[in-house]
Amino acid sequence: MSNLSTNYVMTLLQNYRTSKRKIEQLRYELEHPARVTPDEMIEAMNFAKGDGEGRPSGSVSNKTLYIAMNFQSAADEANAALTHDLVSRLVPLEQEINRLEHYVALLEPRQTEVIRLAYFEGHTWQQISAKTQTTTRTLYKIRNQAVEELAEMYALTADLQR
């Protein structure tokens, strides 16, 4: 298998935990957006003090309402743009991680275990060695075989997409 494919797979594996964290951050931002509601903005502008040009405080001019309505529209557009940006970053990242997880699940059980422990759960090679009662040298061989097989899977789908 080409070095390009194996390097790509190794990069995916090494960045797995960071990518999962980014996915969770983006999901949180989508579910709990920091937004100012149009009603809050209109209310704040509605009771704002004037510039002292003879209007009693608290009165609303047509100009103020026009500005508030424009702000409402601008706020809606900004919120929509933010949501679109979050989704456009989240979807490809989720697809990449889901694909990697699926391909890892297709490996032999021993390979899957080593990849999961090392890259998905972040254990050290010494911890994995103790847990699996396997030498680190053997673990590296298993990892290398798994990376080769993953690279073949990615190469196959790359050929199909052409």
Regions found by a protein language model. Give the residues of each.
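Juxtamembrane/interface motifs at transmembrane-helix termini
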Residues: T134-R137, E149, L160-Q161
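Helix-turn-helix DNA-binding module
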Residues: E121-T138
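Short amphipathic alpha helix immediately N-terminal
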Residues: L106-H123
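N-terminal interaction/assembly modules
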Residues: M1-Y103, A155-R162
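C-terminal flanking helix
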Residues: V147-Y154
